[in-house]
């Protein structure tokens, strides 16, 4: 969440259209933990450059890395979640409601393991020139993203789903 002012002074929050999980996390944080009541506005292309003094915006992905330098107040949503709950936040996961069979699970887990253990190769062979110069692609992919869904992350996910259900 990026803003020119502190949380308690924000009147409007623009919601990035690229991530429903980040949008809902922001709504949960605002209602349950930050205790702020704001106007929610769906963002449109280029919204990051139109944020006024009493506004904030959920900015995700690579755009968030750039936004860090343009706003005096930047709240990392995952860090805010951890600060208030003590649990990690799960932004995305592979899920299904049908049985895919052991063959698929084994192949998927093998591909995931291969990807995780070959991040160095991927970084060498991919153009990350769009990242700000102070961001290392390898660091971003190995420190900012955790690829395994463990019990603690499942607890965090379940708490998030419960709280999201309460505010909807």
Whereabouts are the PLM-identified features?
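Short, solvent-exposed beta-strand edge segments and adjacent coil->beta transition regions
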Residues: 10, 89-91, 144
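Solvent-exposed, flexible loop/coil residues
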Residues: 5, 29, 78-81, 85, ...
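Short aromatic/hydrophobic contact patches that present stacked aromatics
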Residues: 14, 93, 146
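Pocket-lining segment of extracytoplasmic ligand-binding domains
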Residues: 42-126
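Short, basic/aromatic-enriched C-terminal tail that caps enzymatic domains
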Residues: 92, 167-168
């Amino acid at each position: 969440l990026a803003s020119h002012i502190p949380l308690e002074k924000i009147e409007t929050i623009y919601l990035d259209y690229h991530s429903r999980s980040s949008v809902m996390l922001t709504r949960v944080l605002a209602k349950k933990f930050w205790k702020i009541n704001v106007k929610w506005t769906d963002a449109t292309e280029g919204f990051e450059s139109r944020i006024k003094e009493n506004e904030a915006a959920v900015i995700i992905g690579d755009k968030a890395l750039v936004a860090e330098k343009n706003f005096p107040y930047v709240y990392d949503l995952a860090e805010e979640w951890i600060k208030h709950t003590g649990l990690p936040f799960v932004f995305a996961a592979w899920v299904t409601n049908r049985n895919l069979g052991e063959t698929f699970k084994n192949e998927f887990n093998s591909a995931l393991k291969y990807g995780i253990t070959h991040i160095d190769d991927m970084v060498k062979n991919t153009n990350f020139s769009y990242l700000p110069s102070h961001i290392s692609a390898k660091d971003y992919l190995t420190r900012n993203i955790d690829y395994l869904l463990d019990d603690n992350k499942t607890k965090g996910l379940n708490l998030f789903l419960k709280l999201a259900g309460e505010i909807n």
